[in-house]
Amino acid sequence: MIEVKKFEASWCGPCKALNPIFENVSKKFGNDVNFSYIDIDEQFEQAQKYHVRSVPTVIVEKDGQEVQRFVGVQSELAYTNSINENL
């Protein structure tokens, strides 16, 4: 199973800029991939667990193991390619 976790914060401008890209990628994969949003202020322990140091950070996991990490806003193609490589 592929999981894509977006670590964000309500005060983060780049996080807001990433939202439409993340939503488009989510729509492309539907139920084949699990997408989640994690607010680092509300779920600080998750941010610590994944060693998130800046936002936005997107982590792609396959079978519970991290396979790719993106820090900052990337292109829709970058996220899509990473997911496709791990399906």
Kindly give the residue locations of the regions a language model identified.
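Non-catalytic, surface beta->alpha helical segment in thiol-disulfide oxidoreductase systems
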Residues: V60-L87
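CheY-like receiver
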Residues: Q46-Y50, S82
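Structural micro-motif
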Residues: Y50-I59
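Extreme N-terminal starter segment of soluble prokaryotic enzymes
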Residues: M1-E3
